[in-house]
Amino acid sequence: MRTKKQIIFPKFQKLLEQMGENIKLARKRRELTSVQVAERAGINRSTLYHIEKGNPRVSLGAYFNVLRVLGLQDDFLKLAADDEFGRKLQDLRLIGK
């Protein structure tokens, strides 16, 4: 069964590209080569290249493993942690009861 290609709007593609650039900068600050990070993360160097370019087709697990190698795994927990919109919706429902 073929997987459906995900559509990413340009605005959000830019966010992925910025995240990839941040990961690349973190790697370079640690003076690690792409080969070193890829080996430690258990991925191909080409996958790391795609991560650093913000490719949306790379698995979330691969992103996590790269963050782990860079010591940034706690940043992964920040994704969707501050759900301000969800809290406002919840508050509105609670007030309405």
What are these regions (language model features)?
Residues 1-18:
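A detector for short, charged/polar N-terminal pre-domain segments
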Residues 21-36, 97:
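Short basic helix-loop element that most often maps to the first helix and adjoining turn
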Residues 55-67:
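Short, basic-rich loop-to-helix N-cap that marks the start of a DNA-contacting helix
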Residues 31-49:
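Short alpha-helical DNA-recognition segment
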Residues 77-97:
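Short, charged recognition helix plus adjacent turn
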